[in-house]
Amino acid sequence: MPADVLVIGGGVAGGAVAAHLARAGRHVVVIERKSGPHDKVCGEFVSGEAAQYLRDLDIDLEGLGAVRITTVRIYARHQMVTASLRFPAFSLSRRALDEALLRTASKYGAQLRRGHSARSLRPLGGQWVAELDHGRNFLAGGSFLATGKHDVRGWRRPPGKQNDFIGFKLHWRVVAAQAAALSSYVELFVFPGGYAGLSLVENGIANLCLVIRRHSFERLDNSWEALLTTLRADFLALHQRLSGAEPCSDRPLAIASIPYGYVQSRNIGPWCIGDQAAVIPSFSGDGIAIALHSARLGAEYYLAGKANSEFQARLARDVTGQVRVATLLSRVLVKRWGQDAIMGAARVAPRLISDIADLTRIPNDRL
């Protein structure tokens, strides 16, 4: 028997929309390409609005080991500014968060099909059929595309507004003194051509996530080791955080051609959520919130029998402003003059950083 809904992708958006739909009694099948818990190339900042969406799904962030974040430190060359966040926030690994959402979806009755990728997704006689990599097909009345930064054949996103970034992510087991120094902080290191974020997640692990423009990475011979060495030489604080630390894997996770600034505003067929609907620059820390917002909104519109086109248009209205602001700031942040201007302004008006953080959040009246 066909499912009511196919969800392609079991990340934040996919797990959340599956939970919402299954809780409402729909027969949901989730296709997730990884067979078990895994890390993903992204920051792991859970903003206040994201935390509320998770509480609505009965997910206990602190029970999962999430670390409270109250303050941001920004470093550029030999400068540093500090700002308090005006909203409650947490840091939690995607490994833990994604699994919690999939467990919740499963608890409500969603069926999980793990370890297989969707090779294609296509309409068929008023329904949707997903062909998996082992040849099996799944049929459903509706489909949600939630594959994050990875596209499904036939549904490739157009470019964003800033497409030349390469992303890296590596977890580190830091020494106790540096974990204490980092506790309750998220640190942002801006450098010509990119920026890096560092924060604690659960179990005393620090997440180092960064993006760098392709041509800047090429100047370093496309070498992760050279990039990390350069950053540690340029930022004493980062060098201190990683002193004595052990990387949790041999190599960082990596991804290229991130379509920052992309927003889907029309019905292309499947319901697009998460990064398939909007890609906000990583420094904003609001990607998880957008994923959860799109999942809840998509589920509400689907359950109410509203058209996909209405949903995509509403979601675009909700997030376009913040994505546009964040993309503009991202373009400024990767340039030396932009870094100097922002750091200088922040020293004169310390609330500037808090104001920027507010501008890159989903507006309260849209939640």
PLM regions and their residue ranges:
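Beta1/beta-strand and adjacent pyrophosphate-binding region of the FAD-binding site
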Residues: 1-11
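Predominantly flavin-linked oxidoreductase catalytic cores and closely associated redox partners
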Residues: 104-238
